[in-house]
């Protein structure tokens, strides 16, 4: 029995899937995914991230809202790779519940983003999202996207 090769998506293809651009494109690479089920991606955190100028001077910490946005973008990539859209259709970030922050994300960290489908109904898909650094949970949340 042979192991299946990971399905990697590089930044160039990510930019064909998501409308976001610098400084708000927050997924650097997809490491692997299974259509309709789960996706694993990374975001490398540089000291040069624009948010560190004010959050916080002398003590840079990635804002929690950007961690959640990175998870939402990973969710979007999985949605776009899973479904064929009709002209003009998009996936929109529709909701977030039970967000918890467990450790700070700092310059030099590599944040791993894991999203998994938990429920689909009437054009809305619910996901769990977990962001980790070195195996430690930085953030976890339930996320939803809507197809419109």
Curated annotation (Swiss-Prot):
Involved in unsaturated fatty acids biosynthesis. Catalyzes the dehydration of short chain beta-hydroxyacyl-ACPs and long chain saturated and unsaturated beta-hydroxyacyl-ACPs. Its EC number is 4.2.1.59. The keyword Lipid metabolism applies. It comes from the Bacteria. The active site is at residue 55. Its main location: cytoplasm. One of its GO terms (biological process) is lipid A biosynthetic process. CDD domains: FabZ. Belongs to the thioester dehydratase family. FabZ subfamily. It catalyses: a (3R)-hydroxyacyl-[ACP] = a (2E)-enoyl-[ACP] + H2O. The keyword Lyase applies. Keywords: Cytoplasm, Lipid A biosynthesis, Lipid biosynthesis, Lipid metabolism, Lyase. This is 3-hydroxyacyl-[acyl-carrier-protein] dehydratase FabZ. It is found in: Cytoplasm. GO terms for cellular component: cytoplasm; membrane. InterPro entries: FabA_FabZ, FabZ, HotDog_dom_sf. Transmembrane segments: none annotated. GO terms for molecular function: (3R)-hydroxyacyl-[acyl-carrier-protein] dehydratase activity. NCBIfam families: fabZ (TIGR01750), PRK00006.1 (NF000582). It is an enzyme of class 4 (lyase). Pfam families: FabA. SUPFAM superfamilies: Thioesterase/thiol ester dehydrase-isomerase (SSF54637). Disulfide bonds: none annotated.
């Amino acid at each position: 029995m042979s192991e299946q090769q990971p399905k990697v998506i590089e930044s160039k293809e990510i930019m064909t899937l998501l409308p976001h651009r610098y400084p708000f494109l927050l997924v650097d690479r997809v490491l692997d995914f299974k259509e309709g089920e789960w996706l694993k991606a990374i975001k490398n955190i540089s000291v040069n991230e624009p948010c560190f100028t004010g959050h916080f001077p002398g003590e840079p910490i990635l804002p929690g809202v950007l961690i959640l946005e990175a998870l939402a973008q990973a969710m979007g990539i999985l949605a776009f790779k899973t479904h064929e859209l009709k002209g003009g259709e998009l996936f929109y970030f529709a909701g977030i519940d039970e967000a918890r922050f467990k450790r700070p994300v700092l310059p030099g960290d590599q944040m791993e983003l894991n999203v998994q489908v938990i429920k689909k109904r009437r054009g809305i898909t619910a996901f769990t999202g977990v962001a980790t650094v070195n195996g430690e949970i930085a953030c976890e949340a339930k996320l939803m996207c809507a197809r419109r």
